């Protein structure tokens, strides 16, 4: 990792981020003011926050409740990805176990996944909703907190830069100003994808970038989550 975390205004809350990978979602919660602790069953040497290598199925929900103000997670999306649908290959699905842990903890939670994943009444976020992003990258967010989007997703999205000569707009767009595709055929360079997603340059590997979401998504959601925590504690009389 070769970047310095930018300054932000701490909100005094701590959030646990499960299946954190290299930290795209965690970075957004950090920008929203949370202190973040990441959990993943694989080593994550590029993760920029305190990190615990463990399987979420080993976590005690009571321990989680006592040590954190909120919980977040991005269980592996392979089981619900376009690739799985095209190939018919089966992948392990951690969504039920993630939900079970979060609900048992009683904490406000957010769970993120790809379109098509079986999330409950999810909010959909898209890069077009955020100033400065140049990706579509639709993602679903399930929560026990009422979440809203910054604006509606347009019916038609901007054309994306492509290396695919079969596309009618091939050669007409610049990857540093147009929308880009981070994964899949005809995708952009890693550097342009980082810029388009609001990811600091030089932080993530290409695989990490492929699995990440724009931090702007979880910064937006994190601010709503923090407001909910304060409001809930005000109602219950617990010091905010």
Regions found by a protein language model. Give the residues of each.
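S-adenosyl-L-methionine
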Residues: 1-34, 38-39, 45, 240
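Short, well-ordered coil/turn elements that cap or connect secondary structure elements
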Residues: 10, 31-33, 46-48, 65, ...
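Class I S-adenosyl-L-methionine
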Residues: 18, 40, 53-55, 59-70, ...
């Amino acid at each position: 990792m070769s970047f310095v975390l930018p300054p932000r205004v701490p909100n005094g809350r701590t959030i646990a981020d499960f299946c954190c990978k290299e930290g795209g979602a965690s970075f957004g919660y950090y920008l929203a003011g949370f202190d973040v602790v990441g959990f993943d069953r694989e080593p994550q040497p590029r993760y920029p926050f305190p990190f615990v290598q463990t399987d979420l199925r080993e976590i005690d929900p009571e321990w989680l409740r006592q040590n954190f103000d909120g919980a977040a997670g991005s269980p592996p999306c392979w089981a619900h990805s376009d690739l799985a649908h095209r190939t018919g290959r089966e992948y392990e699905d951690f969504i039920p176990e993630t939900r079970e842990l979060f609900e048992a903890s009683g904490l406000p939670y957010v769970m993120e996944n790809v379109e098509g994943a079986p999330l409950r009444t999810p909010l959909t976020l898209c890069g077009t909703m955020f100033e400065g992003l140049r990706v579509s990258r639709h993602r679903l967010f399930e929560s026990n907190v009422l979440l809203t989007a910054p604006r509606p997703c347009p019916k038609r999205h901007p054309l994306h830069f492509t290396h695919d000569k079969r596309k009618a707009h091939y050669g007409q767009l610049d990857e540093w100003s147009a929308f880009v595709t981070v994964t899949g055929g005809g995708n952009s360079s890693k550097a342009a994808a980082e810029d388009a997603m609001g990811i600091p340059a030089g932080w993530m590997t290409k695989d990490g970038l492929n699995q990440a979401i724009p931090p702007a998504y979880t910064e937006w959601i994190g601010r709503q989550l923090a407001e909910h925590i304060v409001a809930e504690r005000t109602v219950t009389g617990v010091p905010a």
